[in-house]
């Protein structure tokens, strides 16, 4: 299972407003119906874009499935280990790369101040992760994988937020409606930059001097 699951997502998000209503007041949920509709719409657009390239035909590997900074150990500012392999599975490799790029590039803050998290992402982090993958793999990312890279980031951003909120009404210690509105803000920042993401993750041209 991956975050690229249309049927599961549509079933869950159709119940999301009712779930939130069990945990939050009407005042807190003002406008949340529009937020949920926006998230559903953006997932649908992204999902269709991914399906158009033939998702199930993409190169498959064993993937971590839950790659984010919290599952990474550091020493002296360097990554020394990746942990938590509970979600290990066989899946199109691009799902892990795109989700990792999302998780490591997202600008965040304290859980008590989600309303003020920056909308933006670290573009250089996205670029560096793809370049590093290409450098150390026997099969660099295909053109079709690069084309859907931001669409998968969008899917992951939405699904990895909606699913846990549907289960408990919150995202960890953060109120569900607050977290969903933050995702909406980040999507509104990210969407106009989709083509730019595709551009920066392209492989360098042969003999190109990257510092020219």
Please describe what each predicted stretch is.
Residues 1-64, 75:
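ATP-dependent phospho-/nucleotidyl transfer catalytic cores
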Residues 3, 7-10, 14-23, 159-212:
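ATP/Mg2+ or Mg2+-diphosphate-binding catalytic cores
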Residues 40, 44, 123-130, 184-191:
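Hydrophobic core segments within long, regular secondary-structure runs in both alpha-
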Residues 47-95, 209-212:
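Active-site acidic catalytic loop and adjacent metal/ATP-binding pocket
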Residues 51-56, 138-144:
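Surface-exposed helix-capping loop/turn segments at secondary-structure junctions
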Residues 59, 64, 68-69, 115-131, ...:
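An acidic intrinsically disordered interaction segment
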Residues 94-138, 154-172:
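Active-site activation/catalytic loop segments of kinase-like enzymes and analogous catalytic loops
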Residues 141-153:
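All-alpha amphipathic helical-bundle segments outside canonical DNA-binding/catalytic cores
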